Amino acid sequence: MVILAYRCLSSARDFEPAHRRASGLGFAEAQRRGWLARRASGRTLEWSTYPGHYQMRVWDEAYRRRWIERVLEATAGTPFDGIMADNDVFDDYYGLDLRSLAPDDAAAPHDLAGLRAALGDFVDDVGRSLTDEGLLLVPNIAEARREAGRWERHAAWGGGFDECWLGWGDKALFDEETALAQAPQLDGPGLCIVRTPSGGVG
């Protein structure tokens, strides 16, 4: 059995205790160090569909280094075999509107291609560091079917997770072409974890 710890790549959550969190970093530390993404108005980016989740500056190398440090600290000496890293996003699911990011954040992406590139670099940074410690990285690789080679690249450090396998939900199943485009993910590399519409709740 492989046991993975959940950590979010892309958000910090203001309702989580710093010592027991799903985010890589606690909210207070992220805020203090200036790693919360901001709009031109100076407001932080709270996810529209998940209150209390705030977009992190995943394009900031200092944030990425600290995220890795914190996750390795939290994982050391535990039974976990690695990390399931959530929100390796492909599209804007959370009302980010990247064009509105603060203009003085020179490294900030202003389109989704730029955000995907930043997350790709982040996944590689995390993967190398976890591999050095004998740990797996299994990102939740959103919509890998939409970009050739995306699954293979992001799953290279231990495997991949697709939480929308064969459909968005019970009332939004994929057509045959879309479902078949997901099929190669079953061949790896590494672990392949998929979540299908269940017909139930939860």
Explain the meaning of each model-derived region.
Residues 1-202:
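Glycan-processing catalytic domains of CAZymes
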